[in-house]
Regions:
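Short, conserved recognition motifs on repeat-domain binding surfaces
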Residues: 1-179
């Protein structure tokens, strides 16, 4: 752990974390969280300076493993995880980490089909790809915003030439920027 006040590094308690992929960690409720595609995650408890393993179960209506993790982030005090639910990446499942009986669980929140967006934004699909090694999707999820007060849920998507937002509640699209 690094102390910016003292300018020194020091060791904290060790934990075997071979299954963990330390990229794209997210700060949530004062702790740092990492997720891996192997049903394993970890949390660095900042106040106790301790790395804790978190085993979790992802409950989905139709659990199938397709592709990797597409988004892991915090919004409105909630921690979200988004991943594809079919091999072409246009059907997405959204999960929220919640505390249930002193146990953290990923609970299914939304099932979203982005296929209708390809009519307005055909650049969401690659013109050429090898289905053996590649996904046809040509977009990235760069944000998932939840506003509990306004009851708004918005997905922010980066395309090759623009950034768009999709409001789930009133089913509207907005072009945020040309890239």
């Amino acid at each position: 752990m690094y102390s910016s006040e003292k300018g020194v590094w020091r060791n904290t308690e060790e934990m075997a974390t071979d299954e963990l992929y330390y990229q794209g960690g997210v700060l949530w409720n004062g702790d740092l969280h990492w997720i891996s595609p192997w049903n394993f995650s970890a949390c660095f408890d900042v106040s106790n300076e301790r790395l804790r393993p978190l085993r979790y179960t992802i409950r989905t209506p139709e659990f199938e493993e397709h592709g990797g993790d597409w988004y892991f982030g915090e919004s409105g005090g909630h921690l979200f995880y988004i991943r594809p639910n079919e091999p072409y990446g246009m059907l997405l499942d959204f999960f929220e980490l919640e505390l249930e009986r002193d146990c953290l669980r990923w609970n299914f929140k939304y099932h979203v089909d982005l296929t209708p967006l390809t009519t307005l934004y055909p650049q969401m699909i690659k013109e050429e790809y090898d289905p053996t090694f590649d996904e046809p999707c040509a977009f990235n999820i760069i944000g998932f915003l939840v506003d509990d007060k306004e009851k708004k849920t918005t997905l922010v998507i980066s395309l090759a030439d623009k950034i768009i937002s999709c409001d789930f509640n009133n089913l509207t699209l907005m072009e945020l920027a040309d890239v």
